[in-house]
Amino acid sequence: MATEKHPLVIGEFRASEDADDAPTVIAYGHFDVQPEAPLELWESPPFEPTVRDGWLYARGVADDKGQLYILLKAAALLAAEGALPVNVRFTCDGEEESGGHSIIDFLEADERGETRA
């Protein structure tokens, strides 16, 4: 979805039964990151994931792509089993590190009337 700044990515899994009457849960995540400076403090290039001592290092690797993936995978598995009790709408933006205004605007103006902030 186009916004004044960065796009808002929206996807949805519908409830396995009675989706039109099921509540909708929103899972929010972001794909932007803080600047990598100062570069001299990095032990490896910030945008090249590197494993050291069993840990993954890269700019943005822990904030919050993994958490959103877990929610996405769980919803997909429940949907595949016919066991998803609610609609799950995933929203992901590129503005969280700078205020996240587009997600707020979307929630307040959702033309489907399904979400309200």
Task: Walk through the language-model features, giving the residues of each.
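Acidic/His- and Gly-rich active-site-bordering loop/insert found
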Residues: 1-61, 78-88, 94
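Acidic/histidine-rich catalytic neighborhood of metal-dependent amide-processing enzymes
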Residues: 64-117
